[in-house]
Amino acid sequence: MQIYLDTANLDEIRTAASWGVLSGVTTNPSLMAKEKGADFKATIQEIASLVDGPISAETTALDADGMVREGREFAAWHPNVVVKVPSTTEGLKAVSRLAREGIRCNVTLCFNAIQALLAARAGAFIISPFVGRVDDVGVDGMDLIREIVQIYRQHRITTLVLAASIRHPRHIVEAALAGADIATCPFKVLEQSMRHPLTDIGIERFLADWKAWQQGK
C-alpha cells in the first residue's frame, strides 16, 4: 500500500519526503487555506518537485464546465497533477470529460460504495472514501473500504482506492488490511506511526549497555 501525505505545508512535505516513504501528496481547499499567503499554483509545483508521484489539486467549481476548466489548468502545471473533484453528478460529468483528455482525476468526498462504483465507471483514476468522517456518523469506515475493494476486484476495476480522513496510525494499518491501494494521512499521524515507547526504551538500553562495555575495556 502506498502512503500519501495529506497537507499543503511544504516543510511537512520536505520532512516526510526525506524519510523515503511518500508516494504522493493530497491537498484540498481547506489545507491550502492554512498556508497563509501561499500561491496555489506555485505550491502545487513545489510539491511536485519534492515528491515524484501523484499530487492531487482540488477544483472549487461546482459545475462540470468549471471543474473541467480548472482541471485542464491544474493538469498543465505538472505531469504528476491529479485533479480532485467531488462525488457529485457534476463531478462525474467532469471526470468523464477529463479522462477522455488523458487527465487523471481523484474523486473525493466518497461516503458509500455506489459513489465509488459510479466514479470508476466515469473514469476516475483514484476514489477517496473518507474513513474518519464515516466513523463519525456511527458507521465503520473500514467496512466501506472493504466493500469498495471487493466490488472493484470482482469487476476488475483498476481505479485506485485511497483511504482518506485518516485520524490515527491504526487507521493506516486497517486500510492496508482492508486492501486499500493508498492511505493519505496528516503529517502528525505519519510521524506518530514511527513512535513506540518500547522502541525508545530499547534504544536507551542498547546505548547504556554499549557505554558500559566501552568503559569496562
Swiss-Prot record:
Transmembrane segments: none annotated. It catalyses: D-sedoheptulose 7-phosphate + D-glyceraldehyde 3-phosphate = D-erythrose 4-phosphate + beta-D-fructose 6-phosphate. InterPro entries: Aldolase_TIM, TAL/FSA, Transaldolase_3B, Transaldolase_3B/F6P_aldolase, Transaldolase_AS, TSA/FSA_arc/bac. Coiled coil: none annotated. The active site is at 84 (schiff-base intermediate with substrate). GO terms for molecular function: aldehyde-lyase activity; transaldolase activity. Its main location: cytoplasm. It comes from the Bacteria. Keywords: Cytoplasm, Pentose shunt, Schiff base, Transferase. Pathway: Carbohydrate degradation; pentose phosphate pathway; D-glyceraldehyde 3-phosphate and beta-D-fructose 6-phosphate from D-ribose 5-phosphate and D-xylulose 5-phosphate (non-oxidative stage): step 2/3. SUPFAM superfamilies: Aldolase. The keyword Metal-binding does not apply. Its EC number is 2.2.1.2. One of its GO terms (cellular component) is cytoplasm. It is found in: Cytoplasm. CDD domains: Transaldolase_FSA. GO terms for biological process: carbohydrate metabolic process; pentose-phosphate shunt. PROSITE patterns: TRANSALDOLASE_1 (PS01054), TRANSALDOLASE_2 (PS00958). It is an enzyme of class 2 (transferase). PANTHER family: FRUCTOSE-6-PHOSPHATE ALDOLASE 1-RELATED (PTHR10683:SF40), TRANSALDOLASE (PTHR10683). Transaldolase is important for the balance of metabolites in the pentose-phosphate pathway. This is Probable transaldolase. It comes from Roseiflexus sp. (strain RS-1). The gene is tal.
